[in-house]
Amino acid sequence: MLVHMRKEPASHRTWLRAACLRLCRLHFCLLILYGVLVGVYDSAHLMAPDIIMKRSVTFGILLVANTALWYAAHKEVQKSSYYKWLIYGVVLIDLVLATVSVYTDRGVASRDVALFALPIISAAVLVNRSAIYGTAFLSLAAYVAVSMRYYFLHPNEMLHVEIYGMLVFHSAIFLAVASLLWVVVRARK
């Protein structure tokens, strides 16, 4: 028995493919900049060698992952869900980059907390409220988990009230970014 499948509009699929390719190219630039900064921090002795090693390994793995996603996006496929999954892969790259950066840079006190906005912004390419808010909550969960892990390993770096205040503040910022992106995306639909 043959099942009749509804054909997806080619324009949406083509748009998703182009968006995925652009997103991967932008992430090449982001990851190259990240690698250069790791090199600069290493040459200036601004970070401990073990942190430089963790960031270098992360850079290498994410660069390979982004290259694989970029290569996969070049393939023309009839289903738009294929490109959606590739974009989810880019979102995952952003989450890993932000999580490792925050953990290796003093947890909640890190300046790299802003990197958690990247997966939310990348998810906005999907033009889907669930993807945007789901990614915001994933970013929030990863941030809280990595910050608390760092805090419990280094308890003398911050006060309890200070860490909880920063966690609530940054979590609210992640949700505000998601809400603002949804307003922009919904207006363009």
Tell where the protein language model's regions lie, with residue ranges.
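Subset of alpha-helical transmembrane segments and adjacent helix-loop junctions
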Residues: K79-L118, I132-L138
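Alpha-helical transmembrane segments and their interfaces in multipass membrane proteins
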Residues: V36-I61, K79-W85, G107, L126-R186
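N-terminal juxtamembrane segment and adjoining first transmembrane helix
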Residues: M1-K84, V183, K189
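Membrane-helix boundary/interface segments in integral membrane proteins
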Residues: L118-V127
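Membrane-embedded alpha-helical segments of multi-pass membrane proteins
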Residues: G60-A65, L92-V96, R111-P119, Y164-A172
